[in-house]
């Protein structure tokens, strides 16, 4: 117990020194666990800075890379970030089995409303990885269609729009199912549950049509050795956004960009510095 207490104190001290703060944001499905990271030396009481909302992929969390590395790089560039766990993921409320893309869009909207209420935030950007890229793009598109303020810029890393085709084909990772009548849930890798509502609802998503309403600047990054999300997903997003988007292939990069993280962080920070 004593060792655990010491470890907790050290962790909290480290987060404080790094300008990080954990907050709970009320979401449609329950509490969303968020981690705010501010630039080193930044005083939120007297200064203002831009903030990027980071959205992780399916079966991931705010604490798994590439999210922490991106938050660190942004902070070093003078840009704040908030990364959060979608409902049913990480430390947020809810069950993985109940997760849907529409619910994740609602989560993103809730975090956006929270960020808009922070007095030290000057401008807002979106970043999404994998399914988080789908959520980020559709959230930005919904905001535009509703005539609301949209993010100043957006980075999509291996945006996983292939989830629609996967659900339509009855094959999601190693799970097999009848796409017209899926079971209550399927298991991916034996322990990750995807519910019937996700398997049916994802088939009907108008991903690119919704995303197309956003006309801000977009940076799309995709590893050439991504074995999970095919490159054509990013190519479709590039076609959707046209001249307002730049599409960059990360040579040799896999889906999690494990060996090319420095390049991804550098390109991400350079993009946001150019739009803020």
State the predicted function of each range.
Residues 59-71, 86, 232:
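The serine-hydrolase catalytic nucleophile loop
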Residues 62-63, 89-119:
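Catalytic nucleophile-loop/oxyanion-hole region of alpha/beta-hydrolase
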Residues 119-130:
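Alpha/beta-hydrolase fold nucleophile elbow
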Residues 18-45:
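N-terminal cap/lid segment of alpha/beta-hydrolase-fold proteins
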Residues 71-93:
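Conserved alpha/beta-hydrolase
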Residues 58, 85-95, 160, 253:
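Short beta-to-alpha linker loops that shape the active-site pocket of alpha/beta-hydrolase fold enzymes
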Residues 32, 134, 139-141, 145-236, ...:
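The alpha/beta-hydrolase serine catalytic core
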Residues 47-57:
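Short beta-strand element of the alpha/beta-hydrolase
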């Amino acid at each position: 117990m004593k060792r655990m207490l010491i470890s907790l104190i050290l962790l909290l001290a480290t987060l404080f020194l790094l300008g990080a703060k954990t907050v709970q944001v009320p979401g449609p499905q329950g509490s969303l666990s968020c981690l705010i990271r501010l630039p080193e030396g930044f005083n939120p009481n007297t200064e203002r800075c831009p903030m990027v909302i980071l959205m992780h992929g399916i079966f991931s969390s705010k604490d798994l890379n590439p999210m922490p590395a991106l938050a660190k790089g942004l902070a070093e560039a003078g840009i704040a970030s908030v990364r959060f766990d979608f409902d049913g993921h990480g430390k947020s409320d809810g069950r993985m089995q109940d997760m849907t893309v529409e619910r994740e869009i609602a989560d993103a909207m809730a975090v956006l409303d929270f960020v808009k209420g922070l007095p030290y935030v000057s401008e807002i950007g979106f970043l999404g990885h994998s399914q988080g890229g789908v959520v980020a793009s559709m959230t930005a598109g919904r905001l535009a269609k509703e005539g609301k303020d949209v993010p100043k810029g957006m980075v999509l890393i291996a945006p996983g729009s292939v989830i629609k085709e996967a659900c339509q084909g009855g094959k999601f990772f190693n799970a097999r199912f009848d796409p017209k009548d899926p079971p209550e849930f399927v298991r991916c890798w034996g322990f990750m549950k995807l519910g019937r509502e996700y398997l049916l609802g994802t088939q009907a998503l108008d991903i690119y049509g919704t995303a197309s309403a956003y006309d801000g600047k977009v940076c799309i990054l995709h590893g050439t050795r991504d074995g999970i999300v095919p490159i054509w997903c990013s190519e479709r997003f590039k076609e959707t956004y046209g001249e307002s988007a730049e599409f960059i292939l990360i040579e040799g990069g896999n889906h999690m960009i494990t060996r090319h993280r420095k390049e991804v962080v550098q390109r991400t920070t350079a993009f946001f510095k150019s739009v803020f």
